[in-house]
């Protein structure tokens, strides 16, 4: 049939491309058979648009290029919604075992982000106050000073919510809000993160307007130079309302965090590039000092970028 012929042509094209690419990297008669018969590990790193993950995985399987000693790495976003994410994961699982699949969020590789687990679970100083008994709210900010640059076509189908919030910012939120894992092993950390995500209060028609803000950057000045609006960027549909800025108020419905809002914000073409977490503590229940002494709430600031570090802001005598 024409469908089978098309699949065959796609398969052959993919196989030829893979072989050619490998020979380009290693000129000495590299063949696909070398991959399968050699003992060394092979990693398929899919640095491609997510809509190609399914096709690539299927072609690898159809060409017998999936074997015990290989791994596949996929980057975010894995799909554009729940259905496409399930479709991609099902296609990956059809060829690879779960322990062969690596779903990568490169933001978790940042030293300051990795340090969140150590900060929380290797120190006792914060644990007693790490809950709604002492914390008023938590802010997570990832601001970028650049526009979409040469990613207009990709970004126009994605937006800030899918590009940043559903991976980077939610990963940070999970590390901040999760309970202590049984161990530092990936499965244990994953299980505690999942509990946080399941506890997030869903948006409703009644609260979506007050708990979220979306926007696009306009014409302006960036780094001292004129910069065009998002709708005038190359590859962007001028009729689209894809957001380049999003701010959310999230709530976690569990004993530790009930009543503590989490404010997430991210955007492009912001004033400066910075990433930080601000833990704002509650004010003292009663001010015993003079009325002129304006006591500010304590703050723990975890700086991810540009200068990694920790600031603890307290009230002291002037």
Name each model-derived stretch:
Residues 1-74, 78-318:
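Secretory/organelle targeting and membrane-embedding segments
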């Amino acid at each position: 049939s024409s469908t089978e012929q098309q699949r065959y042509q796609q398969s052959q094209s993919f196989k030829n491309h893979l072989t050619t690419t490998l020979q380009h990297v290693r000129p000495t008669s590299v063949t696909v058979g070398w991959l399968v018969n050699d003992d060394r590990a092979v990693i398929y790193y899919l640095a491609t648009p997510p809509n190609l993950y399914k096709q690539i995985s299927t072609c690898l399987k159809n060409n017998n290029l999936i074997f015990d000693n290989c791994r596949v790495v996929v980057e975010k976003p894995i799909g554009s919604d729940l259905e496409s994410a399930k479709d991609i994961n099902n296609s990956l699982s059809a060829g690879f075992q779960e322990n062969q699949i690596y779903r990568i969020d490169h933001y978790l590789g940042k030293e300051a982000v990795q340090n969140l687990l150590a900060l929380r679970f290797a120190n006792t100083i914060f644990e007693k106050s790490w809950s709604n008994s002492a914390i008023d709210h938590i802010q997570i900010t990832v601001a970028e000073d650049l526009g979409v640059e040469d990613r207009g076509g990709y970004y126009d189908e994605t937006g800030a919510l899918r590009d940043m919030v559903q991976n980077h910012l939610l990963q940070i939120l999970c590390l901040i809000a999760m309970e202590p894992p049984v161990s530092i092993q990936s499965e244990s950390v994953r299980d505690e993160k999942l509990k946080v995500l399941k506890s997030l209060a869903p948006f409703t028609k009644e609260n979506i307007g007050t708990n979220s803000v979306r926007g696009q950057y306009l014409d302006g000045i960036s780094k001292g130079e004129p910069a065009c609006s998002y709708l005038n960027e190359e590859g962007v549909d001028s009729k689209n309302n894809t957001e380049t800025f999003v701010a959310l108020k999230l709530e976690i419905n569990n004993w530790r965090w009930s009543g503590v809002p989490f404010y997430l914000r991210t955007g492009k073409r912001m004033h400066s590039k910075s990433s930080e977490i601000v833990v704002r503590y509650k004010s003292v229940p009663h001010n015993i000092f003079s009325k002129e002494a304006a006591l500010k709430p304590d703050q723990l600031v975890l700086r991810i970028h540009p200068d990694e570090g920790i600031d603890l802001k307290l009230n002291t005598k002037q």
